[in-house]
Design a protein with these regions (language model features):
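Conserved SDR Rossmann-fold cofactor-binding beta-strand/turn motif
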Residues: 98-108, 142, 155-157
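A conserved structural motif in NAD(P)-dependent oxidoreductases
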Residues: 123-134, 145
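Short C-terminal tail/terminal secondary-structure segment
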Residues: 56, 60-63, 139, 150-163
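Hydrophobic positions on the long internal alpha-helix
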Residues: 24-28, 85-86, 137, 141
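A hydrophobic alpha-helix adjacent to the NAD(P)-binding/active-site core of NAD(P)-dependent oxidoreductases
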Residues: 2-5, 13-14, 119
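Short, small/polar-rich loop/turn modules that mediate ligand/substrate recognition or access, typified
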Residues: 94-98, 149-151
Length: 163
């Protein structure tokens, strides 16, 4: 819960999710920006970088409201931060490095069935993704077919973020 979320956890999450992306980009982006062909950076965000998590999805029966589990605040902050960071990068190396963000939705990879059913009701396609449904977008973003895309945010979430 937000009111009980330890500051140490916040810093740990931000360190991995945002500082890690910053450091990777700082060194990799600097190197590929020197190449005549440049390169591509794809930051992986989430549909929860575009929309707020519906905390009701995490509710469990028999628990008091102040004890209910929630999606940690740091997750959405990191994922939306990656979108902003990508937009910044698109203007920083615009002629050498293409920087885009992929925002996948949830993946049905063994989550509890009742949770999957609750989430699926929030998605126009009424299901979570299969693990192989993101690879086409990644291949496209890495290819010359997307050479004019820079600073874009691509959502692959079955329509969840349109609500």
């Amino acid at each position: 819960r937000l009111e009980n979320f330890p500051l140490e956890n916040w810093w740990d999450d931000i360190s991995v999710g945002l500082t890690g992306a910053f450091l990777c980009t700082k060194y990799y982006g600097t190197e590929i920006s020197k190449n005549s062909d440049g390169g591509v950076i794809i930051n992986i965000s989430s549909d929860l970088g575009l929309i707020a998590p519906d905390q009701r999805l995490y509710e469990q029966t028999g628990m008091q409201k102040d004890e209910q589990p929630v999606k940690p605040v740091s997750y959405s902050v990191i994922k939306s931060g990656l979108i902003g960071f990508t937009r910044y990068l698109a203007t920083y190396w615009p002629d050498r490095v293409r920087c885009n963000t992929l925002c996948p939705g949830g993946v049905d990879d063994g989550l509890p069935e009742k949770f999957v059913e609750k989430v699926a009701r929030k998605i126009p396609q009424a299901r979570l993704a299969r693990p192989d449904e993101y690879q086409g977008a990644l291949i496209f973003l890495l290819s010359d077919s997307s050479k004019y895309m820079n600073g874009a945010t691509i959502s692959i979430d079955g329509g969840r973020s349109v609500w």
